[in-house]
Amino acid sequence: MKFSPLLDELIQSLRCLPGVGPKSAQRMAFQLLERDRKAGLKLASALSSAMSDIGHCQSCRTYTEESLCPICASHKRGSSSTICVVETPADVLAIEAGGHFSGRYFVLLGHLSPLDGVGPEELGLALLERHLASGDVAELILATNPTVEGEATAHFIADMARRHKVVISRIAHGVPVGGELEYVDSTTLALSFNGRIPL
């Protein structure tokens, strides 16, 4: 059966979301149309506002509606000499949820991937280098993902930071709290053994 053009457009538009296939998109569209049109209109309004009004922080590159995000605009956090480098704005939220970091962030919005055409320019590394050259950064914490690309990105940034005499550290990798060793992959287990600490 062929749907009306507007319904088909809605279903196809919902498929742009990660993990949403044709059947899931169809169920979402029908849910909004049959049971919750008010929520559908609210969703449409929120999407429209977000797409037009959310940009990037001029200092750290995370998402914000202002020129500076709340962390960079904060007198306490914005003047911190410690910067944590992450790949995505979602990483900022994850670290903030832990409540153990009180410095600033720099969001790469990806990782180095020459095959995909992602180089230093696309990651905003010129802006990060300006931060490092300012003399206001004492420590750079590299919190990129423990993937091949994340490690390559961390090494590239570490080399850049060394030129500016900045202390560089890398977040630890290893066995998760509450995890059982029999379910941990061999690479993670090797990292845990190599990064062990004395008690």
Curated annotation (Swiss-Prot):
The keyword Zinc-finger applies. A zinc finger (C4-type) spans 57-72. GO terms for biological process: DNA recombination; DNA repair. The keyword DNA-binding does not apply. GO terms for molecular function: DNA binding; zinc ion binding. Transmembrane segments: none annotated. Residues 81-176 form the Toprim domain. Belongs to the RecR family. This is Recombination protein RecR. It comes from Shewanella sp. (strain MR-4).
